[in-house]
């Protein structure tokens, strides 16, 4: 009996520790921060998986053609070689790299470069676009699903699908499996990205906390895109193809387990929390003119980045005889102005929240000017400055308009955010689905200069459209159905809705300050007539 006493004490101590940790995890403020960490890790993983294949797939597909597996190592033989990738950008690898790379070799073991053929370039472009294409197709379904199921279960589903996709990448031996894994990642992203951003908007309902939290999420997205290519390239060369994907799979699994511990999505309390009001249907949100303006801005501002990534390397080689390291480094400095743009917009939004539309319009103008300047650059340094301006403008637009979407849902619809952020994800996916496939054809038929000028002009022309959002900050926040049901007797809800509608029709006071798209029937929650 004596040995059981220490065992019992250990169990009691473990139980107390578990209860203490559980209580700490359930403390509202701490739980909100943990949820932000979980979502940021999920977004980081998604973007790392999106970009980690940049240095791996072209060489791997070329090795499939050659009949060998993994990177070819050459010992004690000097050969011109591509340096390890150092940036979050697919251009240096997606473009046709048939010209000889600049030699900076050594006599040590190095990764022998294998350049994709023209048909393999098409395969690589389709592979990169497949993720965004499937994401584009699934988002109209994932948004309403998130509205109905709350945010934690779809986020868990997304992390699980991303885990499966990453494992498939690790063990893929042919192009079909790579394509299936890439497409599966798009399915996971449609759930994880949308539910994650929606969860942040739900957990941080007030400004400036909401803008700050969404800004942190955007910084993690940018960092994931930056760190993934060198992470993948170094591990691929020294540890093999499977290792970078298995590391990402392990982090994805850990994030899912942390979500289970913090949110407890299958508990009775979680099911009670999931009893949300019925969200506005996604097709009705798409018809909301304010939301349509924001979605158009998100698509327009991301088109230059999505179209320049797969084309700028070839243009640099032909225009300025750029070396491989220059093509690899050209996007790296842009991370700093992107984070600076996020920080600046968050600080400005905290002091002047009614000017979010202006920050977005300035961002579009900066993107437009930067895109138009790119073809005029004839050396490396001016090109870096132009691309830094491009990413700075994208940060302004994203950081200003993502919180605006949540605010529009709060004041014009029901405060359920799955569908509206599915629309935002659709906006991004349109650009990144077209970029890897269409950009090269436009360059071949019209030229790189015309492509850049066209994208810049589109952003400059769209900037004044955001003037239509200038009165959004003056709208009165509506009370959600959940709040009404808590504060009002059930029999009075219908009467309150009818009274408000009658006042509007009889020429009573308007529901909110007038705007170009305003009507009283739109300023009250759509659920009253669903």
Curated annotation (Swiss-Prot):
Q: Does the keyword Transport apply?
A: yes
Site annotation (Important for transporter activity) points to 193, 398
Transmembrane in keyword set: yes
The listed locations are: Cytoplasmic vesicle, Secretory vesicle, Synaptic vesicle membrane
Where in this chain does the entry annotate a coiled-coil region?
none
CDD domains on file? MFS_SLC18A3_VAChT
Annotated spans, Disordered = 504-530
Q: Which UniProt keywords apply?
A: Cytoplasmic vesicle, Glycoprotein, Membrane, Neurotransmitter transport, Synapse, Transmembrane, Transmembrane helix, Transport
Q: Which reaction does it catalyse?
A: acetylcholine(out) + 2 H(+)(in) = acetylcholine(in) + 2 H(+)(out); choline(in) + 2 H(+)(out) = choline(out) + 2 H(+)(in); serotonin(in) + 2 H(+)(out) = serotonin(out) + 2 H(+)(in)
Residues exposed to the Lumenal, vesicle side? 55-125, 174-182, 235-242, 311-325, 378-388, 444-447
In the record, biological process GO terms are: acetylcholine transport; acetylcholine uptake; chemical synaptic transmission; neurotransmitter loading into synaptic vesicle; positive regulation of acetylcholine secretion, neurotransmission; positive regulation of long-term synaptic potentiation; positive regulation of neuromuscular junction development; response to ethanol
Give the span(s) annotated as Mediates interaction with SEC14L1.
471-530
Q: How does it sit in the membrane?
A: Multi-pass membrane protein
Known regulation of activity? Potently inhibited by L-vesamicol.
Gene3D superfamilies, from UniProt?
A: MFS general substrate transporter like domains
Gene Ontology cellular-component terms for this entry are: AP-1 adaptor complex; AP-2 adaptor complex; axon; axon terminus; cholinergic synapse; cytoplasm; neuromuscular junction; neuron projection
What is the tissue specificity? High expression in all major cholinergic cell groups, including peripheral postganglionic parasympathetic cells, preganglionic sympathetic and parasympathetic cells, ventral spinal cord and brainstem motoneurons, cell groups in the basal forebrain, the habenula and the corpus striatum. Weakly expressed in the cortex and hippocampus.
Chain positions carrying an annotated carbohydrate: 89, 96
Between which residues do disulfide bridges form? none
Function text: Electrogenic antiporter that exchanges one cholinergic neurotransmitter, acetylcholine or choline, with two intravesicular protons across the membrane of synaptic vesicles. Uses the electrochemical proton gradient established by the V-type proton-pump ATPase to store neurotransmitters inside the vesicles prior to their release via exocytosis. Determines cholinergic vesicular quantal size at presynaptic nerve terminals in developing neuro-muscular junctions with an impact on motor neuron differentiation and innervation pattern.
State the family it belongs to. Belongs to the major facilitator superfamily. Vesicular transporter family.
**What quaternary structure, including any partners, is listed in this protein's UniProt entry?**
Interacts with SEC14L1.
Protein known as: Vesicular acetylcholine transporter
Recorded source organism is Rattus norvegicus
